[in-house]
């Protein structure tokens, strides 16, 4: 997801300030047929702890069905990538807390590089695995190659997903109203309107709302919401079929080097400025 200027400003609010940011409660849960998830042929899924962004909460619930090997799951609020240092500190602290566990073989991160917020993470006792992804959009599309191809074909697209829709964190009328309420806690009316206008100018760089889903219960109302936002903005609308394979294999394996980066204790995750997106390094280099 692209960083929002408004969200960067809101990050400057005092930590104890209530933003009263509304959620878009038009995405009810519905019954969906859960997939028959299983590990790769001939293998068993490794016992893992899962650290995940809550933007993927319903997708993970769907594709972890039957996953007794996932011993512990922790979800963190979406939008932490607006402050990459805070995301890194939060995840590193969670890794430290998982050190005491003797019943896991690895920690899986349902994140991408996320504004380099996961760069410099260091596993302490258990190896760490993360998909080779710029952000959650790569996870929805199923591969870094598909992400790169779509970015090339539609550089002016803005991505909508069920999770981002639920939190009103995508361009649209409810995002404007939620931002106005939050900014009013910190700034006077003139400054609020200036910041909102700056946000609208950022949105003007885009002309297409691209909606992605992985078959969760809120997929259809989420698509309708994205279409309504596109109409309000005067944008085109497209819906792409998501590919759950990257998320499924993060949860179940296999973790091949082409799609996943494994970081062993004594290593750290760093950004790679090529198609790999990320690599490992030691403190020596």
Walk through the language-model features, giving the residues of each.
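N-terminal basic/disordered segments at the start of proteins
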Residues: 30-67
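Gly/Ser/Thr-rich loops at beta-strand to alpha-helix junctions
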Residues: 51-58, 80-81, 108-119, 134-135, ...
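A short beta-strand-loop structural module common to alpha/beta enzyme folds
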Residues: 70-84, 239-241
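Glycine-rich, highly charged phosphate/nucleotide-binding loops
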Residues: 84-98
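Extended, charge-rich low-complexity interaction segments
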Residues: 100-114, 119, 160-176, 262-285
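Long, charge-dense
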Residues: 126-172
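A conserved mid-domain beta-alpha-beta active-site/ligand-binding segment of alpha/beta enzyme cores
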Residues: 152-220
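Extended, basic/helix-rich recognition subdomains
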Residues: 194-285
């Amino acid at each position: 997801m692209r960083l929002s200027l408004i969200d960067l400003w809101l990050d400057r609010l005092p930590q104890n300030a209530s933003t009263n940011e509304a959620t878009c409660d038009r995405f009810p849960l519905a019954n969906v047929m859960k997939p028959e998830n299983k590990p790769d042929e001939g293998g068993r899924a490794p016992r893992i702890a899962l650290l995940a962004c809550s933007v993927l909460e319903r997708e993970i619930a769907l594709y972890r069905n039957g996953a007794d090997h996932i011993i512990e799951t922790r979800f963190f609020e979406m939008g932490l990538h607006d402050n990459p240092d805070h995301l890194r500190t939060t995840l590193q602290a969670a890794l430290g807390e998982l050190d005491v566990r003797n019943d896991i073989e690895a920690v899986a991160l349902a994140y991408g590089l996320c504004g380099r917020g996961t760069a410099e993470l260091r596993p302490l006792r258990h190896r760490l695995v993360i998909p080779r992804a710029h952000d959650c959009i790569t996870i929805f599309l199923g591969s870094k190659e598909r992400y790169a191809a779509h970015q090339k074909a539609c550089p002016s697209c803005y991505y909508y997903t069920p999770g981002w829709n639920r939190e009103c964190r995508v361009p649209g009328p409810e995002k404007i109203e939620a931002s106005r309420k939050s900014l009013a806690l910190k700034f006077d009316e003139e400054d609020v309107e200036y910041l909102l206008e700056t946000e609208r100018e950022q949105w003007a760089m885009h002309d297409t709302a691209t909606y992605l889903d992985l078959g969760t219960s809120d997929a259809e109302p989420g698509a309708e919401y994205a279409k309504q936002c596109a109409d309000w903005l005067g944008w085109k609308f497209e819906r792409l079929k998501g590919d759950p394979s990257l998320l499924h294999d993060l949860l179940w394996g296999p973790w091949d080097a082409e799609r996943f980066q494994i970081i062993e204790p004594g290593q750290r995750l760093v950004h790679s400025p090529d198609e790999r997106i990320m690599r490992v390094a030691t403190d020596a280099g």
